Amino acid sequence: MDEGHVIVIGGGLAGISAALACSDAGRKVTLIEARSHLGGRVSSVKHPRQDWQLDNCQHACFRVYDRFLQLMGRANAQQSIKLQANTHLPFALPEKKVFSALTTGRLSPPNHMMGSMLSFPFLSMRDKLAMRKAVKALSSMDNQQMWQLDDTLFIDWLRQNGQTERAIDRFWAFFVLAALNISIQEASAAQACMLFKNGLFGAADAFDVGAFTSDLSDSIEPALSSALEQAGVKIIRNSTVKAVVIENNVFTSVKLKDEILQCSDVIFATPHHITARILENSVTKSEIPVLEEMGSKIDKLCTDIGRIEYRSLIGIHSFYRGNRVPKDFTFAVMVDQPLIQMVFNRNSELSSPIEEGVQWVTVPVSAADE
């Protein structure tokens, strides 16, 4: 065992953050990533016929993502994100040519969007008046009360708090789908309440939208790699962890294809099915008769992890000669559209176009399994 050595498995944002935190705490850290690049799902792929880097999906962030923005600051990558000066969330019903936006006004939270909400054409006055009860309940909720709702469906909580079906469909459901990547019929009330309490109805600038000014592989990966190296973190790319070794309830080593790394702690920052696979292959050793008990605990953990489900997120990229949407169009939520939930003009976000005369329009499809 290498005392004090932390091995982080997985080079996505969670793994990178964990590695930096451990290094800052004075620990020796090794980060292992199976692919050739860091960033996990926050990455890009090459267009099959053009020399363009395309993000695997349309990504955005919000000012309330303070830990993510802190990570970008740590990596000196702030310039890769363009944040709105004031919250502006456009909604559209194209077939009826109705467009409107929720914007920040002069009132203090949670009422800072009340002015634009009063003129919001997609909800009736009855819908809007009913929303006051839910907003009041969210504002008075503390964290303990929030997490006690984990086994409650958010749609049931909304109905219990007087929300109309139209408000659920045209307001609450969109934010749940976009932020949690799950339908409102399945979403935990605890998770959704946290989203609205800390986000939309939190600080006045919490939902200022942030867009990436270049492809993710260019804007994030080099900066994060540099930050890790400067912190003294050893990075191992293109290497898959096969198993971990546990002795007397302590992680002592990690097995790669051609080498074994000694350690005293392991952090899993991997998709849950990969975590389960590594643990299933783990080796347990003990000088006291708890080997069977330890193995049983790992088996149960793998079974529990295996119950966790995924929800897919698909990115649709369209390229046009000339403009299909106005040049000053940024993005909009598509009301009453189950598939085309949002439309983004990627040109409005980029620091320079991918090609002169080409307009890039993207559509993220959340909870695409459905």
What are these regions (language model features)?
Residues G10, A85, R237-S239:
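Short loop/edge segments at beta-strand edges and connector loops
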